[in-house]
């Protein structure tokens, strides 16, 4: 399991919720906790992918890169859902409070996801450019926009690589379902209305 020393308010809430589930498991409640990277997928409107990397509902013209040179973990929602279903199907063999990490897609240098979006868009006749995400603008507007303040709280995820180990989920399931990156990105862009 990963160390539980949250540095943010959201992290503290997550830890408290997990502690409550663990305490309830002593009294017969069964819980499976699955931790994953940044979610992306078709029709997923509230995600970094759909709100930070690209603009939904239009062809991909630019791709905003949040942090070049810093690894980042991504989880394709259909893969995460499939993994969760498979874990639930095995719940009788798991301890009452079971924790798992998903490996998903590891973006080694912070560019692989953006480059996958670029490749897929190019296959559909677009010529998107890569640009750095405007963190300066987020800092400037954050005092006036709650969502941007919340975004800044999570910026550490783009400043330091955090990679979860999926050894436990692969030990239980035999493998972790992972759709090839370009296939997952193409389905995501299509679902977000970016491919026409």
Please tell me what each predicted stretch does:
Residues 1-12, 25-27:
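Active-site "gating" loop of Rossmann-like NAD(P)-dependent oxidoreductase/epimerase domains
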Residues 7-11, 37-47, 66-78, 104-107:
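Glycine-rich "substrate-gating" loop/helix at the edge of Rossmann-like oxidoreductase active sites
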Residues 15-22, 82:
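Conserved active-site helix of classical SDR/Rossmann-fold NAD(P)-dependent CH-OH oxidoreductases
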Residues 19-43:
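Conserved beta-loop-beta element that borders a ligand/cofactor-binding pocket
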Residues 33, 74, 107-110, 163-164, ...:
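Short aromatic/basic micro-patch
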Residues 54-75, 79, 83-86, 95:
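A conserved pocket-lining segment of Rossmann-fold NAD(P)-dependent short-chain dehydrogenase/reductase
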Residues 77, 99, 138-176:
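Conserved C-terminal active-site "lid" loop/helix of NAD(P)H-dependent oxidoreductases
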Residues 83-151, 179-196:
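Mid/C-terminal beta-alpha module of Rossmann-like enzyme folds, strongest
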